[in-house]
Amino acid sequence: MSRAFAPYSREEGAIVFVGRKRNPVEPIVSVKDLVKRYGSAVALDHFTLEIAPGEIFGLLGPNGSGKTTAINCILQLLTYDRGEICLFGQPMTQTRYDLKRRIGIVPQNIAVFEELSVQQNIDYFCSLYVSDAAERKQLVKRAIEFVGLEDYTRARPKKLSGGLLRRLNIACGIAHRPELIFLDEPTVAVDPQSRASILDGIKQMNAEGSTIVYTSHYMEEVEEICTRIMIMDKGHTLACGTNEELKALVAAGEKIIIEADVSEAALIKLRSLPHALRVEYESGRLEVVCENAEHNVADVLDALSAARIKPGRIWAEPPTLNDVFLEITGRELRD
């Protein structure tokens, strides 16, 4: 059920939204008031989040927003200036190897050994968590099948395409069947077929019981697979909630799209409509984003009719996460 959102706090211009209290399940990830500085630059500014067991939790934001820094701090790969981090209900420190064994990490940069084969790479990373050779053999076999690398077990990484390398990177991080998996931009620079395969695999891992933390600047991916989403920018949390909760935050309603030859005078008229938030026109395609209102389409068509413009095909699209980001920050997600 969708829950209403209310402003939580403002910190140096940041806007944080939180939902009303959810089910009292102990979070698998809890971060409170995390601050990370590089000299005078603030990478994370009082960053806070909670992730429940079984979620696919998305961290969405442009490059440089603080997503990777947040993950590295949570995993104790980076020191931080202040804050509290708990995993599985226990304080996380650099020496909590018992907690680290329950975690899988898939970094943004490919982290495999060039001199080892696909199978040897997966076996090596799995051995960091599983000492029993017989058990590890089965886990490695399952990981290879899971990512679809059965035909490449003896291949060296340099012989693999970008998409296959990404699959190997994932297999190395999840072979030991972790309860909590962090995936940092796992689909960067891969072809559409490999991207679809990776997203399907993430859904399957979640269905089998793993909690997923997924960072990306690809809005459509996060929108497709994540049960809850946090939007970040410049080290701040801007908004957090389900897909529908986030869209309910924005004043924008549906986007009206019309194929027509539109004059500059007509565009001026459209931009003056009381509910129009954004009007864009290029190559015969008119897009009008309006506030939620009952008569938006009629008002747009009336304005075109008054300018003696005959519209062609007309359709509407619901608001997207990019609309949420644009309204909160005033810029496109990928600027």
Regions found by a protein language model. Give the residues of each.
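Hydrophobic anchor residue at the start of the ABC signature
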Residues: 170
